[in-house]
A protein has these predicted regions:
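Extended beta-strand/beta-hairpin segments
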Residues: 36-108, 116-200
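Extreme N-terminal basic, low-complexity initiation segments
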Residues: 1-14
Length: 200
């Protein structure tokens, strides 16, 4: 008999109408590890791209996690041939303010992915972009039980164009958002409030 607390899914794996295509995670015990796999909806005519990173926690201050205040949240993220990213937790959770936290990295990935698609579409449209900056902001809410999730991310890109129609340049942000791999992978609102500047 199914657990009453387990969400119900249709045959296609969707949770209700318009819900995320994700099947209930299945845990397999492999050599002492618990591997949880989420089976998403299948897209037609796709190619897989794989991304591998390593993470090393270097915050053992001598007694490990013997107490909540007895260890550092610092870590390093690495990948072959790339400089390490020095990370920690948000300072609100006893992290190091000078290091990147996971929440900032998520916001940054949305900003960067949108920018890459925007430049691609601008080049295709014959619009010459000479500068692009963004001030992206994310809002996360945390419940009393400590469980948190992102509520929204707003991008504020300022795009400088040398030629082309400024209004056309502005409208390219919509398809850039629709094509952004990261935006398509999150379940919260990602908004864009662009500014277009025409170079002198």
């Amino acid at each position: 008999m199914p657990d009453r607390d387990m969400p119900s899914f249709g045959e296609d794996g969707a949770r209700g109408q318009g819900g995320p295509l994700a099947r209930w995670p299945q845990a397999n015990h492999v050599r002492g590890r618990t591997v949880v796999r989420f089976h998403g909806g299948v897209m037609a005519n796709t190619r897989e791209h794989r991304y591998a990173v390593s993470l090393i926690w270097n915050g053992n201050l001598g007694t490990g996690t013997s107490g909540y205040r007895d260890y550092s949240r610092d870590y390093e993220i690495g990948a072959d041939g790339k400089a390490a990213i020095h990370g920690s937790a948000d300072p609100a959770f006893r992290g190091d303010r000078s290091r990147w936290n996971p929440e900032e990295l998520l916001v940054a990935s949305l900003s960067a992915c949108h920018k890459l698609w925007y430049l691609h579409l601008a080049a295709e449209a014959g619009i010459t972009v000479t500068a692009y900056t963004d001030r992206a902001e994310g809002v996360m809410e945390v419940g009393r039980d400590g469980v948190g999730r992102f509520k929204s991310v707003v991008l504020h890109p300022t795009v400088t164009v040398a030629n082309g129609d400024p209004e056309r340049a502005r409208t390219l942000h919509k398809p850039a958002h629709e094509k952004c791999f990261i935006a398509n992978s999150v379940n919260f609102a990602v908004e864009c409030e662009p500014e277009i500047v025409v170079a002198d």
